[in-house]
Amino acid sequence: MSRIGKKPVVVPKGVTVTIDGSTVTVKGPKGTLTRTFDPRIKISLIEDQIIVERTSEEKEVRALHGTTRALIQNMVTGVSEGFSVTLKIRGVGYRAELKGKDLQMSLGFSHPVVIQSIEGIQFQVPSADTVVVSGIDKQLVTQVAANIRRYRIPDAYKGKGIWYEGEQRPLKPGKAVGKGK
């Protein structure tokens, strides 16, 4: 039995869950999320808890058991609290700003990088070197943050680039000049 899959998902007050076969719809104060899961996983709603069970002991179904439960938990958390990822921009002349709903960044290219706003994603720029990506769908929020980060992955020597908040990477030492002579 999956250690994650056997735990029930508690549905908080203000969140409604509708299960139609293998399709789960979660509505909350922040929005609505719908997702269709593998039919070999049985999903049921008992009082204020979502129970996830598998119908067979095949290896693939066992793997899907915990994954399905985690995805449902993320849906419930997303519509009740939401998700956000904070990115820090490090580098001389690197900065971000909002242009309407779109995010515009100067990252050392000959042109500004513009990221179009996507439905379900909000950008915030509390300071010129900080970008907050938020929304209710965890997968979408983290994917958009990863796509933004891909424009300038942190440099191993100087640390210039786009970092996740709290990310720690050791910087490599530069060339040792004059040694070994």
UniProtKB/Swiss-Prot annotation:
One of its GO terms (biological process) is cytoplasmic translation. It holds the Pfam family Ribosomal_L6. One of its GO terms (cellular component) is cytosolic large ribosomal subunit. It comes from the Bacteria. Keywords: Ribonucleoprotein, Ribosomal protein, RNA-binding, rRNA-binding. One of its GO terms (molecular function) is rRNA binding. InterPro entries: Ribosomal_uL6-like (IPR000702), Ribosomal_uL6-like_a/b-dom_sf (IPR036789), Ribosomal_uL6_a/b-dom (IPR020040), Ribosomal_uL6_bac-type (IPR019906), Ribosomal_uL6_CS (IPR002358). PANTHER family: 60S/50S RIBOSOMAL PROTEIN L6/L9 (PTHR11655), LARGE RIBOSOMAL SUBUNIT PROTEIN UL6M (PTHR11655:SF14). This protein binds to the 23S rRNA, and is important in its secondary structure. It is located near the subunit interface in the base of the L7/L12 stalk, and near the tRNA binding site of the peptidyltransferase center. Part of the 50S ribosomal subunit. Belongs to the universal ribosomal protein uL6 family. This is Large ribosomal subunit protein uL6.
